[in-house]
């Protein structure tokens, strides 16, 4: 049991160190040697916990999204549209960080490059964090809408990241985020007043 605990602590430390390194240096520039040096382990120990470097990235990404989910959870109010409001707030927080922090933008840009056609996994993880709905049922009923949001989000945010100077010179964060959230409202057949109220 003690060995398992040490292993989990090492894994957590790898994720925390990589979050810092990916943020400061970028994913591609971070080496196993960098990670091992800061964690205080050998390269082989990293591979034991994360067979591929992309596995580390996935763990860091999931952890970062979990922190964002906690921020959202602290602001959700009782509302007949709480699922949608949580969804909007989640993306607003991510968008705010993406807009105002160059290192975060670089981290997210890599996420969009790694994105595949697995929105089910992403949204299952997202909605499970809030305990708002029966996830399987909600995913089944809204599969097309969720896929539309997922791929719209990847494309738009990738474009913002790649052309940030253009967007930041021509639009405010509020204009861009409101535009995005209004598109989500349209996809989910929600009244646009919800965006203005949120």
Describe these PLM feature segments.
Residues 60, 64, 68, 90, ...:
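Hydrophobic/aromatic residues within well-ordered alpha-helical segments
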Residues 128-140, 166-198:
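C-terminal peripheral helix-coil segments that are non-catalytic and often amphipathic
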């Amino acid at each position: 049991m003690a060995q398992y605990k040490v292993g989990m602590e090492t894994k957590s430390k790898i994720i925390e160190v990589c979050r810092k390194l990916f943020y400061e240096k970028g994913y591609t520039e971070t080496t196993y040697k960098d990670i091992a040096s800061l964690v205080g382990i050998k390269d082989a120990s990293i591979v034991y916990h994360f067979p591929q470097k992309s596995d580390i990235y996935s763990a860091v990404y999931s952890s970062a999204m979990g922190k964002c989910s906690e921020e959202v959870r602290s602001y959700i109010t009782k509302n007949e549209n709480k699922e949608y409001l949580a969804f909007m707030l989640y993306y607003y927080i991510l968008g705010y960080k993406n807009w105002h922090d160059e290192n975060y933008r670089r981290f997210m840009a890599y996420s969009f490059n790694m994105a595949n056609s697995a929105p089910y996994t992403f949204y299952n993880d997202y909605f499970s964090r809030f305990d708002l709905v029966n996830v399987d049922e909600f995913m089944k009923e809204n599969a097309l809408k969720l896929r539309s949001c997922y791929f719209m989000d990847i494309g738009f945010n990738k474009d913002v990241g790649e052309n940030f100077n253009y967007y930041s010179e021509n639009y405010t964060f509020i204009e861009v985020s409101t535009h995005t959230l209004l598109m989500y409202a349209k996809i989910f057949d929600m009244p646009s007043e919800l965006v203005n109220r949120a």
